[in-house]
């Protein structure tokens, strides 16, 4: 894939409508696929433009992604996307600079209510590098939220490949929630997400 420029350039390939590009917010359900070959390498990336037929032919494993809206205004669209696609897992993104928001809680509760396993991806760690307390505070908020009645999950911060393997093995229990800390600008942590997807 390609890294972001820090101003949202990478997400332009995900948006369906011009108003999404202007606002920077997903308002619809976008569907994309990612292919892995037999060696675990990603088949389709931004350097090679491939259509879905070519991706499927070249892949030994296909992952379907449904990008859903995160904004409160489009919650009904998100609920429809989650309940109709019946995903194997849901990735909930949290901006390290924003922390837990009302919608983060809503999305976690939706996954719990629909019995969908989920992971948390804390993004934008590049802009909080010099403020370790911000990331620590976000991590603390996540742990508190996941311990709430009705959720009762354990957050597990992914630090290395062994952590990825451990969380992948225990993912079907729904009790351990993997947390990936990533930067879409520097690429830090992205390899752990790719490894998790390919297991």
Regions found by a protein language model. Give the residues of each.
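Eukaryotic intrinsically disordered and solvent-exposed regulatory patches
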Residues: 18-20, 51, 77, 164-168, ...
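Single, functionally critical "micro-switch" positions that shape active/binding sites
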Residues: 23, 122, 182
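Canonical P-loop GTPase G-domain recognition
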Residues: 127-199
């Amino acid at each position: 894939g390609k890294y972001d420029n820090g101003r949202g350039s990478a997400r332009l390939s995900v948006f369906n409508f011009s108003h999404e590009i202007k606002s920077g917010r997903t308002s619809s359900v976008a569907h994309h696929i990612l292919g892995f070959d037999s060696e675990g390498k990603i088949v389709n990336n931004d350097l090679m433009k491939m259509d879905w037929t070519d991706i499927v032919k070249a892949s030994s494993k296909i992952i379907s992604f449904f990008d859903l809206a995160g904004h409160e205004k489009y919650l009904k669209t998100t609920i429809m996307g989650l309940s109709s696609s019946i995903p194997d897992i849901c990735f909930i993104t949290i901006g390290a600079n924003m922390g837990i928001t009302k919608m983060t809680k809503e999305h976690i509760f939706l996954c719990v209510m629909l019995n969908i396993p989920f992971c948390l991806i804390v993004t934008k760690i590049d802009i909080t590098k010099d403020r370790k307390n911000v990331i620590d505070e976000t991590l603390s908020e996540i742990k508190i939220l996941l311990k709430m009645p009705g959720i009762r999950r354990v957050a597990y911060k992914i630090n290395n490949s062994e952590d990825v393997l451990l969380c992948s093995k225990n993912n079907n229990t729904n009790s351990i929630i993997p947390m990936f800390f990533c930067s879409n600008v520097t690429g830090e942590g992205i390899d752990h997400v790719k490894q998790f997807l390919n297991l």
